[in-house]
Amino acid sequence: MPEAMTAMDSQDERAQRLVLVTGPSGAGRSTAINVLEDLGYEAIDNLPLSLIPRLLDGPARPMPLALGVDVRNRDFSVANLIELIDRLTRLPEYAPEVLFLDCTTEQLLRRFNETRRRHPLRGEGSPLDAIRAERDMLGPIRARADVLVDTSELSPHDLKAELARWFETEPGRRLTVSVQSFSYKRGVPRGVDMMFDCRFLANPHWRTELRPLDGRDSPVQQYVMADSRFDEFFRRVRDLVLFALPAHLEEGKAHLAIGFGCTGGRHRSVTMAEKMADALAKAGWQVSIRHRELERREKAPAPGDEGHMRAARTAWAQG
């Protein structure tokens, strides 16, 4: 993924950062607003477009601003929003950016069906008709986006990590490193900067006593690390990452994502991720760790219990 190039790059560094958050209903706009608020933005959602200039004419704010805009805004129209974007771009005191949350039509339809929420544009037609109409309506805004994020395969956790890459508010903050394991069968995670394939290492899956365990368990780690290729592989990857981290920090990056993949995302990749996170932390870097497939298993609802899944789906359908 390319480096985050924002409107701020060409404006005075003293200009206040202003993010307009929009996109089709169900793509995660409300979730994005909450994430930006957590990142230190003053977040305001669904303010009528006609009131935004009045808001900005007031006293300077001590923090960057994130404004949620969608078809539910009282006076929303594509022409009005484009006019607002053009007006903001001409103001020297602001550095506006358009964040567009996108999603496939199929995934949007699935989210609305699962949460049973009514699409804001649905009249007599079907939800699919409303989704397509909104997508067509927002086409010109999408074309004007400074940052485009496709949430089709992102969890709320993934979206938070992705937005942190683009909209971190503390440029002096130390670079943080996220290490994650994943299964190639379920697809490569979005937003990974450095990715390493662990499928050549000895596979504990074929050992009956190790199969139900995972790479956080000592017997599995010992088995994987007993592979004669493990030590050199680990050392080379660790040294490469430790070499690259200071360079990324000098370039102004706030976050670096490292992924380790194997077939099932349960044993080899988890072992490598655990060991690498520990090594980087000992080297003084701020590290977080995530095991994507293990999280999916742990969060899977028991038969007949769909409470957790409904909550996750609702988080998307609200925005």
Swiss-Prot record:
Domain of life: Bacteria
Role, per record: Displays ATPase and GTPase activities.
Biased composition (Basic and acidic residues): 296-309
Molecular functions (GO terms): ATP binding; GTP binding
Positions of the UniProt region annotated as Disordered: 296-319
SUPFAM superfamilies for this protein: P-loop containing nucleoside triphosphate hydrolases
Residues involved in GTP binding: 70-73
Residues the entry annotates as binding ATP: 23-30
Keywords: ATP-binding, GTP-binding, Nucleotide-binding
InterPro entries reported in the protein's UniProt record: P-loop_NTPase, RapZ-like, RapZ-like_N, RapZ_C
Family: Belongs to the RapZ-like family.
Protein name, entry field: Nucleotide-binding protein Pden_2850
Pfam families assigned to the protein according to its UniProt record, in alphabetical order: PapZ_C (PF22740), RapZ-like_N (PF03668)
